[in-house]
Amino acid sequence: MAKTPTRARKRVKKQVSDGIAHVHASFNNTIVTITDRQGNALSWATSGGSGFRGSRKSTPFAAQVAAERAGEIAKEYGVKNLEVMVKGPGPGRESSIRALNAAGFRITNITDVTPIPHNGCRPPKKRRV
């Protein structure tokens, strides 16, 4: 007895005009996530996922490419205005914001949301090179 094939419904992409770009810039990688106002992810990209590996992953150019890739997908949802939330001390902080601006988004607000401890965990020891 053969089953009748069930048709997969085509998902309709919701239209969002305002979004939030979360930029997580660590020393090793940069993650760019674009969400709607409620925090539901629309698109994301990373330096590592953009084809950079090893020490090249932690460069400003890799962060720029990641921001461009996340921005292209977010444009399909109709995002025009972005609020940018930057977290972390990495090298991709500024270049990812510049890339989003160059991609045609109107950046309305830039906020630094880097978590700062009130003397919490002991930090890692200093590097000796």
From Swiss-Prot:
Protein origin, superkingdom: Bacteria
GO molecular function annotation: rRNA binding; structural constituent of ribosome
Keywords in alphabetical order: Ribonucleoprotein, Ribosomal protein, RNA-binding, rRNA-binding
Pfam families, alphabetized: Ribosomal_S11
Keyword Ribosomal protein: yes
SUPFAM superfamilies: Translational machinery components
InterPro entries linked to this entry: Ribosomal_uS11 (IPR001971), Ribosomal_uS11_bac-type (IPR019981), Ribosomal_uS11_CS (IPR018102), Ribosomal_uS11_sf (IPR036967)
Keyword Ribosomal protein attached: yes
One term under GO cellular component: ribosome
UniProt record, GO biological process: translation
Assembly, per entry: Part of the 30S ribosomal subunit. Interacts with proteins S7 and S18. Binds to IF-3.
Entry similarity comment: Belongs to the universal ribosomal protein uS11 family.
Chain's role: Located on the platform of the 30S subunit, it bridges several disparate RNA helices of the 16S rRNA. Forms part of the Shine-Dalgarno cleft in the 70S ribosome.
Protein name, UniProt field: Small ribosomal subunit protein uS11
